[in-house]
């Protein structure tokens, strides 16, 4: 696995040792991509003095932030990302490269307009276009006409439709020539604030629930097939402490709160917007706020030791950013085992082809199929 990252900024060589977070042994995964390299190359070749203040958005593991802190020791950087692993990865990479003293203010992506004024803005194109529109609309609240955003992206994702979406959200955009299959989108704010759209509320009538999502949360306006299967097949019994691991909008926890009226719920996700959506949905459905705790974390890495669950519900992702990987699922299963009481249940839903039953048998020594359809399977393991 390549960990050596090289770049030049304002003539300053930036030689860094960068790692993904959490650590992975997959040799095909690294802590940056060509779009990171292209953004820094573009800045270096712009023949302008490197700014002192930056807003860096969607910097997966801190490659951009580390390079800026190396090239300009007095840099004042706001690091904005929705994912907890991005924050932890950036902090770890700064520390391991002797940059722990860099001035970096860590923020999520729910109030970007308040950090944008007077800063040079660098960002990576997110996969979720609703999240992109929301991000740019937030920035439009405070950017003056002529302020520039530089956005790195894979060339295959850039087309006229995307440029039109950007223009509608904040101002006109043009794309550079291709380099290493990436392009830089230069966005010029037009100075007109756009309304930041409020998420719609939708019903799950078969379970008597109302649900809303912030912009970077999966399943924006309907119950996804896996969650639907899971909600119809929750385990029977009395559970006093239930963790919804990778909670998303919290819909599984909402159903668990109905099903287990005496249970305390822990809703955990690495997406700040997911955790906030879950919090809003708990209130939207008039559930007792004293029964729930909402946790923004890398799986269960920082769950207090005193929390011992008798049930963990989990719908594990099979990607991290654009990388297809199973190491997040492995971490979830290991963390769930650690957090469960003896005899506690891990109850998961996953795509049939992912073969999670093999992992669970290896880790727990047991696994049984609870339900399945053409695409998804519900599996259960006992600690």
Swiss-Prot record:
Keywords: Cytoplasm, Methyltransferase, rRNA processing, S-adenosyl-L-methionine, Transferase. The keyword Methyltransferase applies. It is found in: Cytoplasm. It comes from the Bacteria. Pfam families: MTS. Disulfide bonds: none annotated. One of its GO terms (cellular component) is cytoplasm. Its main location: cytoplasm. GO terms for molecular function: 23S rRNA (guanine(1835)-N(2))-methyltransferase activity; nucleic acid binding. HAMAP family: 23SrRNA_methyltr_G. Belongs to the methyltransferase superfamily. RlmG family. This is Ribosomal RNA large subunit methyltransferase G. The gene is rlmG.
